[in-house]
């Protein structure tokens, strides 16, 4: 009988500590990730712009 009381007390303690220490994650974190993906795409296009222009010029010379 004592074992069941101790086990239930430990379970309740773990449950209470888990509920208190679990801070809710902010909702805007998802939007920050989306913004980061968009920023990476934009930066990639800016860096690839000169290379695409050179390829376009090379194709026009080949015709």
Curated annotation (Swiss-Prot):
Which positions carry the signal peptide feature in this UniProt record? 1-22
- Its domain of life reads Eukaryota
Q: Which Pfam families match?
A: Cecropin
Q: By its UniProt entry, which InterPro entries does this protein fall under?
A: Cecropin
Organism for this UniProt entry = Bombyx mori
Provide the family line.
Answer: Belongs to the cecropin family.
Protein name per the record: Cecropin-A
Where does the record place the modification Leucine amide?
61
């Amino acid at each position: 009988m004592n074992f069941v009381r101790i086990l239930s007390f430990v379970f309740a303690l773990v449950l209470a500590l888990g509920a208190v220490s679990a801070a809710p994650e902010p909702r805007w974190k998802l939007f920050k990730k989306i913004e980061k993906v968009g920023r990476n795409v934009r930066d990639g296009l800016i860096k690839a712009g000169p290379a695409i222009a050179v390829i376009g010029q090379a194709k026009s010379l080949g015709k």
